[in-house]
């Protein structure tokens, strides 16, 4: 089951059940036409329950394509109540912001991703008595925040700075999964 909160899967998920969550309407998880990443956890049990039984019996792989820390609109990726690094850059025109504002806005997205991952792990923990569960988190790219006058990401790998190439990898295993040989 592919859940997408970014710009769609661009055909990658065409052969599997998929849901685009970024355009949903939810009073606390969406604002101004965009949804925050925890929307992917909303109604997740029902989405899995709607899969064919034969497919569920084999096990379910969930792919959650986050909006995460994608710029330049870092300020839109985090609900106001979760913003702890201020002042933050509140425009898409990154050159109009100080380095401190830009880093604060980006750091808010990282902290909110931590919150989202904690929620995802909590969801998995609730199911670990009946299922062996695992979470693997990996980012698709790093991000430049003005170092050497570079912003965002997307340079060819051969010339991209390390901050665009080095990404986090986080793994969480349920007790049952960890005990497997």
Question: Language-model segments: what does each one mean?
Answer:
Residues 1-181:
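Catalytic domains that recognize anionic headgroups
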